[in-house]
């Protein structure tokens, strides 16, 4: 694994200490894959595994291979199915952590249209639902790519305010939090990801 450094892990440590479950949110920015591995290394032994989602392969025979590739000590990958969502809820209620990319465009019927940088974007409701249903603490995190192969620097911060109990408003608040993160270091935003695409219909 490439070198990892933490700019600040205080938000994560304080959220774990409250024992209510932690929901880590990261946009398509920097190296989002490294954030899950870094969290598992830093907090897994003390606070239990981090649960993340993966989209199952079209060829079912590949799913076991994909799961084995993603799973490692302190990290569990679950499919983007109802069973996977249930595992995430179970983990949060047990005081463990879950990681999500809330700017991932969900399948049709699993999101709502909400503003993102001034344009309507189909936005998942899952992140807001998980936080509201379980009382999990929301922490923002991203993995900064360091120059010249120097590894990664992890940044965490609290959401900064309570999510609205209204789901639609909470989804907008999460989009706003993602915007703030991107604006802090826009050169590391993955512009190749089509945030404004129409949702797929194969939910």
Residue ranges and their predicted role:
Residues 20-82, 108-115:
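Catalytic core of membrane glycerolipid acyltransferases/transacylases, capturing the structured
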Residues 9, 26, 104:
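Residues immediately flanking
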Residues 7, 53, 157:
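Residues in well-ordered beta-strands of folded domains
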Residues 2-6, 59, 78-82, 120-121, ...:
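A conditional alpha-helix N-cap/helix-loop micro-motif detector
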Residues 16-17, 41, 82-203:
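Non-catalytic C-terminal accessory region of glycerolipid acyltransferases
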Residues 1-22, 30:
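A short, well-structured juxtamembrane/interface segment
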Residues 11, 34, 84-87:
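Well-ordered alpha-helical segments embedded in enzymatic catalytic cores
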